[in-house]
């Protein structure tokens, strides 16, 4: 067998080869300390969930470190494996048998359409893990909020999750508009209706979100 690790990223990172080398090196060191008869291979892969562009940072150690002239051939390289989740093909996604197939599909469609609302009716087997991952990788805390209020089995497909997100968004916006009107902030009502960043700022101002 081998030891596998995963590093989730939403943005490309220049020094990722150094980070992964550190993780893998620590794992090999741990095996030595446990005095394994024969240490096993360690493989850490990077799952990149960005939807604006593909991973465009170095994937080789030699591309991020300074190597004095004449020493290049003596310095060992270290290559990392990066999967651009939002650019996976249908054939590649079809190979997944776990909930990750649902997650991968979500990001592929999100890349193609930023306003994508999932209609995937595939049953999610591990709801907590999937919603926590989506929350972390999209920055949308509403996925975590669903976990806090969900009844067992209530939100076990992406289409039911999406429907609830839409309802939550409408309820929040309605509450915000009422608060703005109560404070006679007519111009801010207009901003909240069309500007996502302004709306988020107002949500925080009125304590609608943290």
Where are these regions (language model features)?
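Short, charged alpha-helical interaction segments and adjacent helix-coil junctions
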Residues: 1-10, 83, 107-210
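Coupling/switch segment of ABC-type P-loop NTPase heads
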Residues: 85-90, 94-115
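Accessory alpha/beta interaction modules
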Residues: 1-96, 164, 196-204, 208-210
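Glycine-rich, flexible loop segments associated with nucleotide phosphate handling
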Residues: 38-41, 73-76, 102-108, 122-129
């Amino acid at each position: 067998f081998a030891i596998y690790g995963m590093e989730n990223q939403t943005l490309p990172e220049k020094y990722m080869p150094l980070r992964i080398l550190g993780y893998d090196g620590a794992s090999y060191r741990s095996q030595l300390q446990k005095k394994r008869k024969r240490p096993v291979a360690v493989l850490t892969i990077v799952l990149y969930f960005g939807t604006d562009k593909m991973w465009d940072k170095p994937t080789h150690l030699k591309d991020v470190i300074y190597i004095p002239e004449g020493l290049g051939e003596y310095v060992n390289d270290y290559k990392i494996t990066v999967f651009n989740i939002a650019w996976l093909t249908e054939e590649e996604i079809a190979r997944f048998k776990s909930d990750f197939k649902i997650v991968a599909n979500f990001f592929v469609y999100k890349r193609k359409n930023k306003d994508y609302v999932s209609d995937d009716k595939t049953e999610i087997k591990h709801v907590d893990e999937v919603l926590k991952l989506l929350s972390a990788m999209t920055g949308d805390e509403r996925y975590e909020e669903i976990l806090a209020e969900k009844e067992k089995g209530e939100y076990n497909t992406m289409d039911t999750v999406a429907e609830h997100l839409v309802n939550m968004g409408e309820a929040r916006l309605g509450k915000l508009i009422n608060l703005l009107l109560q404070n006679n902030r007519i111009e801010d009502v207009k901003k909240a209706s069309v500007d996502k960043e302004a709306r988020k700022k107002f949500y925080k101002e009125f304590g609608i979100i943290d």
